[in-house]
Amino acid sequence: MTNTILDTYSSRRKPRRIGILTSGGDAPGMNGAIRAVVRTAIQNGCEAWAIHEGYEGLIQGGAMMHPLYWEDVRGFLSRGGTLIGSVRCDRFREREGRLQAARNMVLFGIDALVVCGGDGSLTGADLFRSEWPELLNELVSTGVLTVAQVAPHQNLNIVGLLGSIDNDFSGTDATIGCYSALTRICEAVDAVFDTASSHRRGFVVEVMGRHCGWLALMAAIATGADWLFIPERPPRDGWEDDMCSIITKNRNRGKRRTIVILAEGAQDSNLDRISSSAVKDVLSKRLGLDTRVTVLGHIQRGGSPCAYDRWLSTLQGIHAVKAVLSMTPESPSPVVIIQENRIRTSSLAETVALTKEANASMHAKEFEKAATLRDPEFMEYHSAYRHLNTSDHPKMVLPEDKRMRVAIIHVGAPAAGMNPATRAVVAYCLTRGHTPIAIHNGFPGLCRHHDDTPGSVREMHWLESGDWINDGGSDIGTNAGLPLDDIETTAQCFERYKFDALFVIGGFEAFTAVSQLRKARKQYLAFRIPLVLLPASMSNNVPGTEYSLGSDTSLNTLVYFCDVVRQSASSSGHSVFVVEAQGAEYQATAAALAAGAMTVYTPERGITLQSLSNDIEYLRQQFSKDHGANRSGKLIIRNDQTSTIYSTTEIANIIKHEAKNRFDAQGVVPGHFQQGGKVSPIDRIRAFRLAVKCMEHLETFAGQSPEEIMNDENSATVISIKQSRILLLPMGGPTGVEATDTDWKRQRPKTQNWLEIQEAVDSLSGRSSLYAIPN
């Protein structure tokens, strides 16, 4: 392509051109970011340009840089890696390379860049912007470009997206790709469980993460690993003895497998590397364990992104374009982050500087400082893991007068996360000297079968729940029955078995149960004990919290189902699938965003004949312009409570009838499949942390009188995730959750923090207010 032809790109006044590139190591979710940037740019009257192979494409120019249109990014959401390529470009580190990149930016008329990558990629981006005026001056002074060519491009806007499986950036809760990588690790370790147990083997599993131990720490928690090595927390001298002691105790309890998780950057306090082979040798020689080493390697980067990475990359991509359009010449380059569970922007330079400071702190042996600069929850997770992994330690056991008989009960529909949470409660209780007691099959089980043999009220032991780390459903049984169904017998059982605290896990029914017990304290002395609710519901509808256990597992299951259905729809050509989703509005809306659905029908929105007619007309427009294009199948998600008239089947039939043979439509119902199988890593690690927090709260009431407990509003609480904060909120009182955030009629919170997602679903499908594809 000649300079004369290229000149036309900058000489004609066109809409703003926003370039998107991915650089450094690939991460699942990058394609979701590309899709969001492209379609949001088009929605805002801009052009989106792909720059292939990262900064190398920016330097080479030519065919490496081209526009992306609306349909070009169809199907991107479910694809792993990056479809526009990524390389580690040494040439961009040199000024000559950046000079060539600036030349191509001007010639192609691109005046804004969205860069998705790691710290090296974003450091290069910030340097590129700071040098931009000098680079243009040099290109003009050397005759490479003319004053007229560079005049429209005096300012360069750059926005960063954090794409890294390592989650090694400071100041953000998560990076694009980190939870998908964690999912790959957990899938691999879950598979190792079977062979390890069969042969009573030990496995040392080495995971990626460079100098950051986030992946290793979360994998250790999510798989119940016996021991953990991370660079931020090097083991003390003599770690071999400590590790062997813990593993020996676990083996003596009857555990058949041993799992050790080791970060690839693991080191001791002298910064000497701890290798997986060295750990294997310790286990083999000292304990005589048949031990294997499994280095997961690049398998962690691959595969389809999990639901979290899909919606994170999508919302951050949307935010990146908005940031570009709102920037002034004086604005510092921003980076889009997620902080306190909200999408925000921060200073790119400061974020990179803090990340480098964390790495420098480790090299300086300032491990405490390095750990505090990681993910905000890093320290708490590590502390909780360490405490629960050192059961029988004399320093952890409480005095006799502080020990409690803690009853554990599951209430409501089964939800993934119930078992891992129960496992964590049991482990914590045994570590601290408490007695964990399982109430089987909910309140009806307590009332009807506590006298049976075996009874429904049974003490739990360490080995009994040891393998529940990834089990879905409820192994102690759950039931929707409530205390008021038989309040007299419930009180008698509480008194008979001398419960000192009640740990309730479940959804809105569990919330109702705790409310009933709290209100019945005036009549029944047995209920004057601390009560705590850990929300677990695929519907994510427990008042007071933004997150319930099981909702992530269910969402991933539904998204996988939608991916398979979409594949069928696309293979068949012009097909529409209407998928019915359980789990209140949250599941349908979040799945629509993560699966790239055309639209979502929820009770909040409702559905009318007019809105359905508009959507059918939109489908006609879409299919008429496809002309046999690939991946042309469409997806509509409908919550099962949306309408009693317009059922999933009815909607599909109406669409099919109105299509008049131009396209097909079918309704599909995943049903209870949506509850999921194995628990997702996010549900596992949150179950662990929330269970520990709940137990720490219950311990504060040890030794108090029944009257003191009854008069303390914090003695009946629900644990809540609000933004990224974990709070224990009182159920009762004028400012309690029951009064301020409970919609009893609809069985959900009054505050719905995820409703803004619906706008993103419509925007990225092209189904905006006029139901027309943007030109």
Curated annotation (Swiss-Prot):
Catalytic activity: beta-D-fructose 6-phosphate + ATP = beta-D-fructose 1,6-bisphosphate + ADP + H(+)
Keyword Magnesium among record annotations: yes
Residue numbers binding ATP: 25, 88-89, 118-121
Disulfide bonds, paired cysteine numbers: none
Regulation: Allosterically activated by ADP, AMP, or fructose 2,6-bisphosphate, and allosterically inhibited by ATP or citrate.
Molecular function as annotated in GO: 6-phosphofructokinase activity; AMP binding; ATP binding; fructose-6-phosphate binding; identical protein binding; metal ion binding; monosaccharide binding
Subunit: Homotetramer.
Protein name: ATP-dependent 6-phosphofructokinase 2
